[in-house]
Regions:
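STAS-like cytosolic regulatory interaction modules
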Residues: 1-56, 66-109
């Protein structure tokens, strides 16, 4: 793990009828719980996860994306990725899961 992992952050904001969660840093064993903690736990507003600034993702990060998606499905709220980085796309394609995630444009304020 690099120093960037220790500075992973994710924050949520409401934009255009969706909750936008912006993730920055390495989505790994340290970052994955931080990502999940940033997700809203109530409501039915769609969740859009902006991954443009994720420079690395390992299996822990992949698991957090799957957990976030499932939590949204269970709550009846739409879930989508926005601007996934090359590194994120590479992992999703490697494990043949890219088609499991809807990819949308980033909501605007």
């Amino acid at each position: 793990m690099s120093d960037e992992s220790a500075t992973f952050r994710a924050h949520a904001q409401v934009l255009s009828g969706a909750v936008l969660v912006v993730a920055v840093g390495e989505l790994d064993l340290v970052g994955a719980p931080r990502l999940l903690a940033a997700l809203p736990d109530q409501g039915t507003t769609p969740v859009v996860l902006d991954l443009a600034s994720v420079g690395f993702m390992d299996s822990s990060g992949l698991r957090s994306l799957l957990e976030a998606r499932q939590a949204c499905i269970d709550a009846g709220r739409p879930f989508a990725l926005s601007r996934p980085s090359e590194q994120v796309l590479r992992v999703l394609e490697l494990v043949d899961l890219s088609s499991e995630f809807e990819v949308v444009e980033r909501p605007v304020s």
